[in-house]
Regions:
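Exposed, low-structure sequence patches enriched in small/polar residues
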Residues: 35-37, 43, 123-421
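Outer-membrane beta-barrel channel domains
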Residues: 1-199, 409-411
């Protein structure tokens, strides 16, 4: 539901990301599972325009790994205005349930509140978003705000958009997703579409350009980098697509970085700019087909070396009973000595069975040689009432170093019930 997910700016300033709950950091800095004891989520409509949502989760303490028990809450209100626009308020709270000697004062709690306005014109030409968020921690600080804006206009031939965001150095959202703090980012985008006359195969051609400029005002090197992405796209009448793309990147490393994540390897040195260009070719067949394919090839420079990637997704379905897909991603990273080179594989099949209108079974399997992990997630769903479901979820994870060794295993029962008042 957008009540719990549609906040901030995707990838750069997301104050709430539900999958952060249940994940913690141990004493060695490793990311590990933090068991969830209980939780609930409520959402509903007060009237035709006003909706509210409340989510609360309690996680288990793990003193051996220096992890306290936390209570995490999100409360949100979203109200529709004008033809299609809306505004929203939210409050996020992550707080220790008791005092712990091993928890630093500034980590005892984290609170974020915010306001957002989402613009959508009646004719669909104008869209946009503006937001302002503020975080609160036990330590007083001045640069604890985050705000941003995006405004877009879309016509038959032109699509133009301009966005910008700021996240303060002291802003924190423990339940959110932020790749960095203390930055300013600008993201202009333009697309021009050509509709050929009397074509029996092509819907339109599109020329587009996207740029991203990132600044770090309080760093010694205040310019972090830029991306310039130019592409040519063809959309066919049968819903297949073809695209050619050029990516020109310039990144500054503030910290040593190993893009291969090879244990014990020498990372790329920090305090340097890396400029590189790569190219991408992508093609996808219509999803409506019995068998469909999405394929992408990327090749070119990568930091001070080269990279070759192939991403494939194969889908097969027999409606309405069965649907399966297979993702195969391969990355070959070649860096000059003494830096590491590596071939990285990600293989992920998915199976979906529909037994009847009320019972469904979905299974995900994922293997990657980068983290040497094999994961299985299997979910049985029973829709016992309108918008109400009972889930039985099985999770299994294995290390694949030499031999397959179990990492952790869990069985969860989840109930979703719609109360119509």
């Amino acid at each position: 539901s957008d009540l719990f997910t549609d906040f901030g700016q995707q990838r750069d300033a997301e104050p709430f990301f539900s999958r952060r709950i249940g994940i913690a950091t141990d004493l060695d800095g490793n990311t590990i599972e933090n068991k969830i004891i209980r939780g609930f989520r409520l959402s509903g409509k007060i009237n035709d325009k006003l909706r509210i949502g409340l989510l609360n989760v309690l996680t288990e303490e793990d003193k051996a790994n220096g992890i306290p028990q936390n209570n995490s809450t999100l409360f949100t209100i979203r109200n529709k205005v004008f033809a299609r626009s809306n505004y929203a308020f939210f409050f996020i709270n992550r707080e220790n349930t008791k005092n712990y000697d091993f928890v630093e004062n500034q980590k005892k709690y984290n609170r974020v509140f915010g306001f957002e306005y989402n613009l959508a014109s009646e004719n669909g030409e104008w869209s946009g978003r503006t937001f302002i968020h503020k975080s609160i921690t036990p330590e007083k600080n001045d640069k604890n705000a985050s705000f941003g804006m995006r405004l877009s206009k879309n016509t038959r031939k032109h699509y133009i958009s301009m966005g910008g965001s700021y996240v303060g150095d002291d802003f924190r959202s423990d339940l959110g997703y932020y790749r960095r703090y203390g930055f300013i980012k600008l993201t202009p985008f333009y697309q021009y579409r050509i509709y050929p006359k009397n074509s029996t195969t092509v819907l339109n051609y599109a020329l587009q350009h996207y740029s991203a400029y990132v600044f770090r005002p309080n760093k010694k090197e205040s310019f972090e980098g830029r991306w310039n992405i130019s592409s040519f796209e063809i959309k066919y009448l049968n819903q297949s697509e073809f695209e050619i793309k050029q990516n020109i990147k310039r990144d500054y490393l503030y910290y040593d970085f190993d893009p291969t994540r090879t244990e014990g390897a020498i990372p790329l040195p920090a305090n340097n700019f890396y400029s590189y260009t790569d190219y991408e070719i992508a093609y996808s067949t219509p999803d409506k087909n019995l068998f469909s394919v999405r394929s992408k090839v990327n090749f070119g420079d990568f930091f001070n070396g080269t990279k070759f990637s192939i991403n494939n997704e194969l889908n097969f379905r027999v409606q309405p009973y069965f649907n399966t897909s297979l993702k195969i991603n391969y990355d070959s990273i070649e860096l000059p000595e003494p830096y590491p080179s590596r071939d990285i594989w990600l293989i992920s099949p998915k199976f979906q069975f529909t037994f009847n209108k009320k019972t469904f079974w979905t299974t995900y399997v994922q293997y990657t040689n980068q983290s040497k992990n094999l994961g299985i997630n299997s979910r049985l769903q029973w829709r016992f009432a309108p918008l109400s479901d009972l889930y039985l979820v099985y999770n299994d994870n294995y290390f694949t170093t030499g031999s397959i060794e179990p990492q952790f295993r869990s069985i969860n029962l989840k109930l979703t019930y719609w109360i119509n008042i």
